[in-house]
A protein has these predicted regions:
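Beta-propeller folds
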Residues: 1-222
Length: 222
């Protein structure tokens, strides 16, 4: 057993329910463990050492909240949570992300992204290659349940690609970004890519000249 939730619950007088783990690549030996007391939506986040099978002494520890936390690097987390009372969307999700450095208190975390209160949800994250290597920051804004603004931050500058907000960013592999279209879209050259098409393109080149993205078709429905 890597983490005995029954024993932990007994020791802490809680009823911990496992809400997930985000492990830091490429070693995957440090994980952010999300635990919910009694299974509610809100959870706490604690840093866990897989090899030691123990929580890290003086490691990252986020108090209970409806939140997400992801690794930027071994000493930095991107945390999206209700930083100030009422700082949630109408759907009840946080939309402000701050960077939290190891050893900092929550009030020392620096804001790096703010969505809009009208969004369904929003947050900042990271893009990694298949080997876990950091590529760049990303962000998303859930405009509604069918439309999302997906942004990338090459050199720290926000770039939004010209695809419909219904398009879904699906994968990144060795420099190639993969999207699935959920409505028809025409490139600057006039090439029409139909609803349901799966397309791929060189992300670095696309971000340098987003108006002229010309993808390759991986799959086109009949």
């Amino acid at each position: 057993t890597v983490l005995d939730l029954d024993a932990l619950s007994k020791a802490e007088g809680r009823k911990w329910v496992f809400h997930g783990a985000d492990c830091l690549p490429p070693a995957y030996n440090r994980c952010l463990i999300s635990l919910s007391d009694g299974g509610k939506d809100a959870d706490v986040v604690r840093e866990f050492d897989i090899a030691a099978r123990a929580f890290v002494k003086d490691g990252f520890a986020l108090p209970e909240g409806k939140q997400t936390a992801t690794w930027r690097d071994a000493d930095t987390l991107y945390v999206t949570r209700e930083w100030a009372p009422g700082e949630v969307t109408a759907s009840g999700y946080a939309y402000v992300t701050r960077a939290l450095k190891r050893g900092q208190s929550l009030d020392q975390a620096v804001e790096i992204f703010r969505g809009d209160k009208a969004d369904v949800s929003a947050g900042r994250g990271v893009l990694r290659d298949i080997d876990g290597r950091y590529v760049m920051d990303t962000s998303y804004r859930g405009l509604d349940f069918f439309n999302t603004e997906q942004a990338f931050y090459p050199n720290g500058q926000k770039v939004v690609l010209p695809f419909p907000t219904t398009a879904a960013f699906s994968a990144y592999y060795k420099g190639q970004a993969v999207y699935q279209l959920k409505s028809d879209w025409a490139s600057a050259r006039g090439t029409v890519f139909h609803n349901g098409a799966v397309i791929a393109f060189d992300l670095k080149a696309a971000l340098a000249d987003p108006a002229h993205v010309e993808p390759t078709v991986l799959f086109m429905p009949n």
